[in-house]
């Protein structure tokens, strides 16, 4: 239910698999039934879950609640690769000797790009504070297009 074929008017990407994580993220099922059900063999069964390599999560520090000083951690808790793909980075809050920031940090090489973090992110206007950029896509161009800026 998470993976769809790109529409025919999508240019080079027509009929290629894509994921709309905000609508339905990949759950990184241990047996990858999507790969087994794929009629063309376009989806391969990865050796391990983090090897799925669908993309990498990118955090917008300007809109992420944790970077604003609030304790959120929703993306961290939603991640099936918790403490591997997303970790919580503790650091002093700039200009504040009393409070700390508990900010999510994506470990690119361990992120499978499943999108559960994006699907569950409570920030939505204009876009989630964490989005999955598909493998091979330019992160800045992709997020600008998703946010309606390009």
Question: How would you describe each model-predicted region?
Answer:
Residues 22-36, 61-76, 100-123, 144-150:
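Short Fe-S-cluster ligation motifs
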């Amino acid at each position: 239910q998470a993976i769809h074929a790109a529409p025919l008017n999508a240019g080079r990407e027509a009929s290629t698999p894509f994921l709309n994580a905000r609508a339905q993220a990949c759950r990184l099922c241990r047996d990858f039934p999507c790969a087994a059900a794929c009629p063309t063999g376009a989806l391969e069964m990865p050796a391990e879950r983090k090897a799925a390599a669908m993309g990498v999560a990118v955090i917008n520090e300007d809109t992420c609640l944790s970077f604003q000083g609030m304790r959120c951690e929703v993306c961290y808790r939603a991640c099936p690769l918790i403490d591997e793909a997303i970790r919580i980075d503790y650091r002093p809050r700039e200009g504040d000797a009393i409070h700390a920031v508990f900010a999510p940090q994506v470990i690119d090489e361990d992120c499978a790009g499943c999108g559960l973090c994006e699907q569950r992110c409570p920030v939505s206007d204009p876009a989630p504070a964490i989005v999955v950029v598909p493998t091979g896509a330019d992160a800045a161009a992709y997020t600008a297009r998703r946010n309606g800026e390009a």
